[in-house]
UniProtKB/Swiss-Prot annotation:
It comes from Suid herpesvirus 1 (strain Kaplan) (SuHV-1). Residues 1-39 are annotated as: Disordered. Pfam families: Ribonuc_red_lgC, Ribonuc_red_lgN. The record marks 830, 833 as: Interacts with thioredoxin/glutaredoxin. Disulfide bonds join 278-506. The keyword Nucleotide-binding applies. Heterotetramer composed of a homodimer of the large subunit (R1) and a homodimer of the small subunit (R2). Larger multisubunit protein complex are also active, composed of (R1)n(R2)n. Substrate binds at residues 262, 277-278, 308, 489-493, 666-670. This is Ribonucleoside-diphosphate reductase large subunit.
């Protein structure tokens, strides 16, 4: 692809040669967000393009002048080339009129994509072509560099804009590299990737303009470079010169080697928004007044900045009485209503997960607060989630039940036993049983009944999540005896201390594993480099984060917690021609986790070697004693033990800059821009469908579709194979029967088709190298009779417990027996942790 020159000052559009060659990536014209985000940004953006008369009278003249100008010649030529390529595929969608305006070209692309996208079901080339068209629509409306720098709507931080202007020649050189080297791959990703960029991440500017793809990456890289201290710069690239630092960030971001969290992509470099993703709160309220004050003073400011919240309310544990007639549920209803109100006008909804322990007096009410389980509207809380912070004792008693012991009980306590929340392990078990003997419990029920209530709620409502209290405390980097950790975050992958004066705060980014493939093999050196860049990038952004509360500022100051994750594990395994169940894939899975941890820790140690101070409390941490996260696990096999030994010595001598390093989050949003599989999970389906106000958006499994094209070179045979998959609910096994080992199609299983015990075991393989946790969901298919037994889910939770995992269950996703095999979107999810 010929290079594209950056736009000169004042130019209407940059010179951009006709786009030819392999299909590139694109963005769709209309809203593709979930109903929760309606009206979404893309819909609003297109409304301003197609019907500017609806805009304010002040803005309309400028918008009219820009949008009614002729579509740039380079975009028109590229559009003509793409339409010709579509005609070669048998799809003639016409063409815009000669000399069409920007508005007319955008409207034409909108209609073309809406008419073509349904063909993605049978032809992956159309899916990619639609993406290319959307990219062209973005280019038809993008601002020039000067307009972008000066945009009041974008509101660049003055220091960031000044740095770009000061080093403009170097920035423009980076842009030439981008259009020549990085953009062709982005352009070829697919429709969903392009849609996600246009709808969510590219800023909308004045007069119908939008942020360009290259400007988006400039904004992120320039913000990070401006915030990077000299020691960070030396760790990153060996130079503290701003242009060198900018280049290092820009190339890693533009090639999608690293993908920042959604708050960073939205707000980095801008004088608005907060950059942190995850907030953990434990305000310790004991009364209704204290609980309401915590919600309004601590939770609301975070939600208004679009952060996701994990909130411990274990301390609010009063049985109904004269001055507290509804226990915790009145407070949860207030929290639910506030969350709904804040999300009602948000382009990016977020959420709250409330943490309680399973001995909380109101735990059954919490389990019944969502969906059909809510007894009446006054108790319904569909806008928040719950998670059980579950001690080992619960699983030990359930195991006794499984072993045949009769009348195994589980006891609920009120605030007379509030000190149990600060205990874990044997200390908790001894005190819990002492309180039982004293008769202080408010109620006892059979352990199997309690287990059933948990599973029923998870299966029917998507909540509660379940985390292992003792595992989280056992593996924490400081001693938590007598001051147990009480909460995780919204998506169950962050493990931090939270107190009334100090929130846990974590800043996130992920490494895109498919970007680490080279020559048909996995490049561990590339992974290590990406992990180091991600660590320095997030540390730099942490310095300029606009945190919503004083307790959040204190949490960042003390721990500097990183959450570097991964995405595209299943995509990578497929690209290496492996099945997730292959022993080689199991080994690769663990090796990737080890290399990720090493890369992040190595960078963090080097920051201290170059003069930065270790995190507050390092001297009391396990790191100071030479203990690594994996040392508490049995039978851990290291790829290169000697380098870990050397790292221990370096830590003992210099310290480590960050208190925490690796968190494996879901990456729902960011894996859409890379078209990679989410996080560490297998893909949910071979044909994803999302229904929005403008129709159905399909996302085929591109590697599967490309494999079918190779296996069935005759078009009629390929179409027949696709039809078989369609009839078989997009299950390869159901469509083609039992395939021999090594068959090119045999590896295309979905998360619902894999043995869930295998997926849990793979989490356990990674666990020694994940000092936070992993957002592990369960993917279960309902039996033909429609009855999913609670014992099946509990069996999986017991396996997670016995393997020492910290997260036992994030979502419990159920595929109905009558499902058509096309996994539908629209679930209530948080884009802060999902990246």
């Amino acid at each position: 692809m010929p290079p594209r020159a950056p736009r000169p000052a004042g130019a209407v559009s940059p010179p951009f040669p006709p786009l030819a060659g392999p299909p590139l990536k694109a963005r769709a014209p209309r809203a593709r967000d979930s109903p929760l985000t309606s009206p979404c940004r893309a819909h609003a953006a297109m409304a301003s393009v197609v019907a500017p008369a609806a805009s304010s009278s002040a803005a309309a003249p400028g918008a009219d002048a820009f949008l009614d100008a002729a579509c740039p010649e380079d975009v028109a030529r590229a559009l003509a080339a793409e339409l010709e390529a579509l005609r070669a595929l048998g799809h003639d969608v016409g063409a815009p009129a000669p000399g069409a305006s920007r508005r007319e070209a955008a409207l034409f692309i909108t209609r073309a994509v809406d008419g073509l996208k349904a063909f993605s079901r049978v032809d992956e080339r159309v899916y990619v072509a639609c993406g290319k068209l959307v990219h062209l629509r973005v280019r038809s409306r993008e601002a020039d560099l000067d307009a972008w720098l000066a945009s009041p709507e974008l509101a660049l931080i003055p220091a960031v804009a000044a740095a770009v202007r000061r080093h403009r020649a170097r920035v423009e050189a980076a842009l030439r590299w981008f259009w020549r080297e990085a953009y062709p791959a982005l352009y070829a990703r697919g429709l969903q990737s392009a849609l996600k960029y246009e709808e969510m991440y590219l800023a909308r500017l004045e007069h119908g303009r939008c942020e360009a793809m290259d400007q988006f990456f400039v904004r992120l890289a320039a913000a990070a470079a401006t915030a990077t201290r000299r020691p960070m710069a030396l760790v990153l690239c060996g130079s503290d010169a701003w242009p060198e630092v900018f280049d290092a960030y820009f190339r890693a971001l533009a090639t999608q080697a690293i993908v920042p969290a959604t708050p960073l992509m939205l707000f980095a470099g801008r004088a608005r928004g907060s950059l942190a993703s995850c907030y953990l709160l434990n305000p310790l309220p004991r009364t209704t007044e204290e609980a309401v004050r915590a919600i309004t003073d601590e939770v609301a400011p975070i939600l208004l900045r679009r952060g996701g919240v994990g909130l411990s309310l274990q301390s609010f544990n009063r049985t109904p009485s004269g001055d507290c007639t509804r226990g915790i549920m009145a407070v949860l209803k207030a929290l639910d209503s506030m969350t709904a109100a804040i999300n009602s006008d948000s382009e990016r909804p977020t959420g709250v997960c409330v943490y309680v322990e399973p001995w909380h007096a109101d735990v059954r009410a919490v389990l019944n607060m969502r969906g059909m389980l809510a007894a009446d509207e006054s108790l319904r809380c569909d806008n928040i989630f719950s998670c059980l912070w579950t001690p080992d004792l619960f699983f030990q008693r359930y195991q006794r039940h499984l072993d045949g012991e009769r009348a195994v009980k589980w006891t609920l306590f009120d605030d007379r036993a509030s000190h149990l929340a600060s205990l874990h392990g044997p200390d908790f078990a001894r005190e819990y049983e002492r309180l039982e003997r004293l008769g202080l419990g408010v109620e006892s029920l059979p352990i199997q009944d309690m287990a059933f209530l948990i599973v029923r709620s998870a299966v029917m409502t998507g909540s509660p999540f379940l985390m292992m209290k003792d595992a989280c405390n056992r593996h924490f980097h400081t001693d938590t005896r007598g001051a147990a950790l009480a909460t995780s975050n919204l998506c169950t992958e962050i493990v931090q201390r939270a107190t009334p004066g100090e929130n846990g705060v974590c800043n996130l980014a992920s490494v895109n594993l498919p970007a680490c493939l080279a020559g048909g093999a996995f490049d561990f050196a590339a992974l290590r480099r990406a992990a180091r860049v991600a660590a320095v990038f997030v540390n730099a952004m942490m310095r300029i984060g606009n945190y919503p509360t004083g307790a959040s500022v204190e949490g960042v100051r003390r721990s500097r917690s990183l959450g570097i994750g991964l995405q595209g594990l299943h995509t990578t395994v497929l690209a290496l021609d492996m099945d997730m169940a292959d022993p080689a894939a199991r080994r690769l899975n663990a090796a990737i986790a080890e290399e990720l941890l090493y890369g992040v820790m190595d960078a963090s140690v080097e920051l201290c070697e170059r003069g930065l101070r270790p995190f507050d409390g390092f001297e009391h941490s396990r790191y100071a004693r030479g203990v690594m996260p994996f040392d508490a696990y049995e039978r851990v096999s290291l790829r290169e033990p000697m380098r870990w030994d050397a790292l221990r010595v370096r830590i003992a001598e210099h310290g480590v800059y960050n208190a925490q390093f690796v968190a494996l989050m879901p990456t729902v949003s960011s894996s859409q821009v890379t078209e990679s599989s989410e996080g560490f999970s297998p893909t949910f389906t071979n044909m994803f469908s999302k229904v929005t106000i403008s129709g159905e958006l399909l996302r085929p499994n591109l590697p599967l579709m490309e494999t079918l094209r190779r296996l069935f070179p005759r078009e009629c045979a390929r179409r027949d194979a696709v039809a078989r998959l369609e009839r078989a609910q997009w299950s390869v096994a159901a469509a083609f029967g039992e395939l021999p080992a090594g068959h090119p199609l045999a590896k295309f299983k979905t998360a619902f088709e894999y043995d869930q015990e295998l997926l849990i075991d793979m989490c356990a393989d990674r666990a020694p190298f994940v000092d936070h946790s992993q957002s592990m969901s369960l993917f279960l298919t309902e039996p033909a009779d429609g009855k999913l037994h609670a014992s099946r889910v509990m069996g999986l939770l017991m396996r997670a417990y016995n393997l020492g995992l910290k997260t036992g269950m994030y979502y419990c996703k159920i595929r109905k027996a009558t499902n058509n095999g096309v996994f539908t979107g629209g679930d209530l999810v948080c884009t802060s942790c999902h990246l």
